[in-house]
Amino acid sequence: MAKLTKRQKAIAGKIEAGKAYNFVEAAALLTELSTVKFSESVDVAVNLGVDPRKSDQVVRSATVLPHGTGKTVRVAVFTQGPAAEAALAAGADRVGMDDLAAEMKGGDLNYDVVIASPDAMRVVGQLGQVLGPRGLMPNPKVGTVTPDVASAVKNAKAGQVRYRTDKNGIIHTSVGKVGFDAVKLKENVEALIADLKRIKPASSKGIYVKRVTLSTTMGPGLVIDQGSLDV
């Protein structure tokens, strides 16, 4: 068994095994334990009572967090005409059609979100092998294929997160940065869970939100006492 580093020992000494933490307490502890030289993301993992092997129990959506994620989001939009002007006015970093597709095929993929209007899907459809593996393929289920590209750009820039259950029925997403106030982090997590409950599959039985775990990029995961969340 590999020996624990000094940092790992220090972390282990401050975490109570088996404890479900009050959210504000957990946020404060994660901040205390963050010793890296960059601003770590604060991430949440939510274990859901679903069977992702069943297509009607795959949970997938997008929601705008009230306080954003603290990240600068680069957005590319496939559209044309007045919609292109609206997308640029909304803050899109790049707008185009065939020219943008050619750039992406050439390896220019420095974007966090790709949005498309329905009429642009004839162009975007050629990029499945380029965008798909990176999770960038526009999809109407998460609002990235829409005639209202300007609103989609604004949502992306405002801190919209997209999520989907993995093979174990868990969703993972960022909910802020270590420097965020604990109350803002809490409100972001509450907004996420409210959205998860809104789209609960009708066929899901028993406990739906089974476990909520908060962590940082390089830190430990702390189980959250759901009673400390207002949702």
Swiss-Prot record:
Keyword Nucleotidyltransferase among record annotations: no
Keywords: Repressor, Ribonucleoprotein, Ribosomal protein, RNA-binding, rRNA-binding, Translation regulation, tRNA-binding
Entry function: Binds directly to 23S rRNA. The L1 stalk is quite mobile in the ribosome, and is involved in E site tRNA release. Protein L1 is also a translational repressor protein, it controls the translation of the L11 operon by binding to its mRNA.
Name of the protein: Large ribosomal subunit protein uL1
Subunit record text: Part of the 50S ribosomal subunit.
GO CC, any one term: cytosolic large ribosomal subunit
HAMAP family referenced in this protein's UniProt entry, alphabetically: Ribosomal_uL1_B
Protein family per UniProt: Belongs to the universal ribosomal protein uL1 family.
Gene name for this UniProt entry: rplA
One GO term (biological process): translation
GO molecular function annotation: rRNA binding; structural constituent of ribosome; tRNA binding
Organism whose genome encodes this protein: Pseudomonas fluorescens (strain ATCC BAA-477 / NRRL B-23932 / Pf-5)
Pfam families, A to Z: Ribosomal_L1
Matches recorded under SUPFAM superfamilies: Ribosomal protein L1
Lineage: Bacteria, Pseudomonadati, Pseudomonadota, Gammaproteobacteria, Pseudomonadales
